Amino acid sequence: MHDLKWSKSEKKLARNVFNACLQVELVEMVNTFKSRAAAATTADDVWAMEEFLTQKRREIDGKYDFRYSQLLVVFGRLVREGRLREDELHGFSSDKQSFILRIASL
């Protein structure tokens, strides 16, 4: 199922959806960091921020994989997490939408 062919319009939509979801997650991470930094009063608070950033980087790098062979799984996960809505999948083939929604339901 991962070897489905991607049309030119699907590739463009995939890139736009991927970038939009990634950008939202990065903005959330930056805002959380700013809040924690503003509240930091001890060295332990600073080290905790470093741990937070390291963990978020691993999480985001592992989640956002723009290989076409992985995108359906990536989008399924984003739907499951509430970062991508089902109506944002319109424009992908029905096979791709079905696969994404199956992944989201796991």
Language-model region placement:
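Acidic, Ser/Pro/Thr-rich low-complexity regulatory regions
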Residues: M1-L106
